[in-house]
Amino acid sequence: MPARRNPTARQVRLGTELRRLREAAGLKATEAAALLGVNSVQMSQIESGIAGVSEQRLRRLAANYACSDDALIDALAAIATDRTRGWWEEYRGVLPAAYQDLAELDHHARFRKDVAVIHVPGLLQTEEYARALFAYMNPEFPDDEVGLRVEHRMRRRVVIDGSDPIPYETVIHEAVLRIRVAGRAASRAQLDRILAVSEADHVTVRVIPFALDDFAGAGSTMVHLGGAVPRLDTVVRDAPHGTAFVDSDAQLEHFRKLFRRVKEAALPPEPSRDLIHQLMKEL
């Protein structure tokens, strides 16, 4: 297959998982290349996501790697053969690649879990709230780029607002709900949006109140996206250099434990809604 100039996060993940399977089998890249009848450069491109791999070749590699996890192999084959061109492709080359990667990961996710301690999670943001955030960025974005970023964020909400939503669970610190990003009216509308979404059967919203003693998780902002199998989960975090996609087994387990701890510290859903109602009355 021809080399890709800019592989997506899912394509890179496929290559990463094939490399991990090869390493677990104790094979060198040159040995894996021989199994497919390609050279070491082509094998390196496959394992870095720069080049694709057919389902037949993927299953041949998995068999030679003695991988007996059929669910994982099927999930990897689904990624390898996926030809979806979603709405996010309209923004490729216009917005940063991470925007398209996150939208694509959302689209394919089996579930999503957020922890928010600074800003309202993107999927819950109103248009006015999102616009205020993007307009405040430093360096400043031109007005047309702010508009594109807001539009992209609003379209991403389809995964919880659309006709085929995914299970969504979020834990939000009270500080997030109190910060007036765009004034009183906008803050009231934002809280109303959170309350409305929280009523859906597939959505669970929990709030960590200021009154909670011994909460040291102020740096816990994260997005956890469920893969077709747990091994293919992805955690998304903001990093100094941009958006970081975390996928090693050890890191994933770390963030699963972190989410459980933060969730346990939060109020149950109904008291969380009561607190949000109270905050609306204060505006």
Give names to the regions the model predicted.
Residues 2-16, 20, 24, 29-34, ...:
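Interdomain hinge/linker segments and adjacent boundary elements that couple functional modules
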Residues 171, 183-283:
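C-terminal regulatory/effector modules of DNA-binding transcriptional regulators
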